[in-house]
Regions:
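Short, linear, compositionally biased motifs with a strong N-terminal bias
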Residues: 11-12
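C-terminal motif of bacterial Sec signal peptides marking the signal peptidase cleavage site
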Residues: 15-18
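Lipid interaction determinants
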Residues: 20-166
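Positively charged n-region of N-terminal signal peptides that target proteins for export
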Residues: 1-6, 20
Length: 166
């Protein structure tokens, strides 16, 4: 009798553990909640245009200084706050004339809208009141969006925009 009771508790415990919530995948509605900073532009080095390569270098330089041109905050209440400094980039040549000087923009445009995220598709209303739907890939703390689809000023020639969760 004691043995049957022990087996019953072990089986019951295993069932409870196996029925617990699984690890959240990148397509669940909660996977996108949080603040995401644009940290990189991933391009095909073999076929990339000069504009894509230039964008990649700029994002790399700014990210190394903890300066993020675009931040997206997805709230639990389905509001989306976008902070975008890409319109305020001032690119120059450094004092030695040997490379670029890209100071972190101090000015940002901030917009608030609503969004939905389901099965890897992000849908939101843009500043022109148009509904935009994008395919989004989320893997842990990394979110990837097509640069052409998101259409961030100066970074929309091609490639994939890489966002990192704060």
């Amino acid at each position: 009798m004691m043995r049957n009771t022990l087996v019953l508790f072990l089986v019951g415990g295993l069932i409870l553990v196996s029925c617990s919530t699984d690890k959240m995948d990148g397509t669940s509605a909660d996977a996108i909640v949080g603040t995401w900073d644009l940290t990189a532009l991933d391009i095909d080095q073999q076929t990339a245009s000069d504009e894509e390569e230039f964008g990649q270098v700029i994002l790399s330089e700014l990210s190394a200084e903890n300066c993020y041109l675009v931040s997206l905050t997805f709230n639990q209440d389905l509001s989306l706050i976008t902070e975008d400094a890409s319109n305020y980039l001032e690119i120059g040549v450094n004092a030695g004339g040997t490379g670029l000087e890209v100071p972190c923009p101090s000015q940002r445009d901030t917009e608030t809208t609503t969004y939905t995220y389901s099965d890897g598709v992000l849908t939101f209303v843009d500043e022109n009141q148009a509904t935009v739907s994008l395919n989004v890939s989320i893997d842990g703390g990394t979110m990837i969006i097509s640069a052409q689809e998101l259409d961030v000023e100066n970074f929309n020639a091609g490639g994939e925009l890489i966002f990192s969760r704060r």
